[in-house]
Amino acid sequence: MGPPSLVLCLLSATVFSLLGGSSAFLSHHRLKGRFQRDRRNIRPNIILVLTDDQDVELGSMQVMNKTRRIMEQGGAHFINAFVTTPMCCPSRSSILTGKYVHNHNTYTNNENCSSPSWQAQHESRTFAVYLNSTGYRTAFFGKYLNEYNGSYVPPGWKEWVGLLKNSRFYNYTLCRNGVKEKHGSDYSKDYLTDLITNDSVSFFRTSKKMYPHRPVLMVISHAAPHGPEDSAPQYSRLFPNASQHITPSYNYAPNPDKHWIMRYTGPMKPIHMEFTNMLQRKRLQTLMSVDDSMETIYNMLVETGELDNTYIVYTADHGYHIGQFGLVKGKSMPYEFDIRVPFYVRGPNVEAGCLNPHIVLNIDLAPTILDIAGLDIPADMDGKSILKLLDTERPVNRFHLKKKMRVWRDSFLVERGKLLHKRDNDKVDAQEENFLPKYQRVKDLCQRAEYQTACEQLGQKWQCVEDATGKLKLHKCKGPMRLGGSRALSNLVPKYYGQGSEACTCDSGDYKLSLAGRRKKLFKKKYKASYVRSRSIRSVAIEVDGRVYHVGLGDAAQPRNLTKRHWPGAPEDQDDKDGGDFSGTGGLPDYSAANPIKVTHRCYILENDTVQCDLDLYKSLQAWKDHKLHIDHEIETLQNKIKNLREVRGHLKKKRPEECDCHKISYHTQHKGRLKHRGSSLHPFRKGLQEKDKVWLLREQKRKKKLRKLLKRLQNNDTCSMPGLTCFTHDNQHWQTAPFWTLGPFCACTSANNNTYWCMRTINETHNFLFCEFATGFLEYFDLNTDPYQLMNAVNTLDRDVLNQLHVQLMELRSCKGYKQCNPRTRNMDLGLKDGGSYEQYRQFQRRKWPEMKRPSSKSLGQLWEGWEG
């Protein structure tokens, strides 16, 4: 072959190689959704890192430099990530199932949290079950659900290391593959963050060594920064001047334009503010171990060669607030600090360092994990896969045009709690007035004729009374007038039905008298009942106008024998009727005690029968008012408990079962078979009574539960709790690791029983608002483009038509099921809502594009800080 032909061959080979390389380059970018063939696994590994109570608004991510370097600089940061409920167990249930709270029915951290109903209906349909059935090596490490007791291993997990109950860092119990494992307080062996990190790394390495071609799914669920905020010893001195939590809404209280708990929460006291500073510091310290954990996992993926074939997701179950709006700490509010969470994704085909403005939710995690694994997403999941949002959509050349902007949701539901009773049609007026105080509602009810009589009407259940302070109250009617209907019904039932359906239990050889015989024998022998005290009586309790007074007796009253007048229906002695009026002053004997008696956390009764309180109560009018209000609440609570106990005692006296006469065949036994209808159903009279008994038993169970809580608080000297409020007491013994709290105990309330709400959060190119409806009928609306920290409720600026349209949208979200119903698409903003309304009439801002939707920094809020005092 000559030189010219040789040169021609070389030139042809060069051109062919260039064309082939270009073709390979084009095909690589056009098919970038597919994984490279030289990887060991066809399907990628998935690692979900979940933290507990981690905020975004208070700057917790600012100190996690390792995590931000790995996830933010090396992956995608979703700047509009939210949860659909700011509660631990409901949010975690949504993460596992991909469903809204109203579809998995876990409304609180107690109700239906890891219950048998949850296990039967929803736990068998988590993302772990689907991936485990298709060959994934699944593993869970850390906190699961608040009420998980370790009695079983949830389905779908090959490796299970689950924390029992709520978050702890020391002295906890794990369920390791069905075996309970207790841990102590040794940092090197027991610190939970490090332990689950080491276990997860060991599991991943072992899986890749034994099953190199099987993908791995791991969930690493940290307890940090949840309480009790125990940090690792090496980080206990960091952040002495932490102040990221001091936002414009910090100590912004009271808020008369917001819902109930916000209106009655005043500014924090100095001890509360000092607590918030230390709490923020300790939370950041616990996150340092999570930061180390992320670096350890990253290095493990690099060493095993699985980094480029692994999706890593970092997020939290909900946010947190520390001092915002005067609330010392907590979550459960529908505001940004409680529903915004960190959300980072790193993995194949994810552009490094990008900011994604689309709304992502906790319900999107389950469908996203299924989509990454190549599985079909069940239609009953409410969330959507965000995998398509991670596609960079970069054009290959100028002839490859960019695709149309992806259609994505612009609104979602935020819900907490459920409405136990349906609202009546006549209560719609409460929404129009936005709020009707309780005293006003009671006052309106007392205007009705049926509540003005003193329980004299047949079937009357309530009466209106006025207490000593002139305050109107509704009291429940008790006695024959209210029970007339039920007693008339019970008289129609034969006597043998009162004995119940259970057979008598008789002891052989024992002869028992009838009820009349026992009473006759009791009176004849002057028998002393077992409940009569044999010792002298030194004081008696007298109830006057619903209040209980303990009156001391000068001379010890001797116990009396029971006489015939003690039985129901017997005439009272004349002496008892002429007792005269009772006076609570004078005639009381001197009482001496060895030590002062602690009545409240600030007041004592001394040996000389005088009361002594803290000096602050005598100097500060506000402290005096607060403590007096606290004592009034305690007295009212105890009085209600005593009334309930007396009602139960009276019921038990009337419903005492009669003993059986075992030597005589009763009429009930002889005719037992005749009294039943076909199909073994109960007699209709008895059936009606049985349904009433069930209702009564449910009420009794609730009363007993409240009584147990009351007794427990009294035993623990807990005088912090208020009726209808969720409160906590903090003292020097709460934190067992440095830095320690040394400023003494204090009480604070964080939420209320009526804090049930449904909200719609909307973010798009033109709108950025939150609209809420509370169970009390209260409405809230915040325009976050003009009020990013939700300082002012702007619901009064909206027209009635706009409110109605927002209400319709919210009701649709509250009842949605499946991703087709629960993900409303972006609407035409020129037309407003889909019903034809327009937002232009109340918008006070100009349209903004996505890059301008970022939250303003603290430096740009100088005007808000002027004149503000923390």
Swiss-Prot record:
List of residues binding Ca(2+): 52-53, 88, 317-318
CDD domains reported for this sequence: G6S (cd16147)
Keyword field: Calcium, Endoplasmic reticulum, Glycoprotein, Golgi apparatus, Hydrolase, Metal-binding, Proteoglycan, Secreted, Signal
Cofactor note: Binds 1 Ca(2+) ion per subunit.
3-oxoalanine (Cys) sites (modified residues): 88
Cofactor requirement: Ca(2+)
Protein name per UniProt: Extracellular sulfatase Sulf-2
Species the sequence originates in: Homo sapiens (Human)
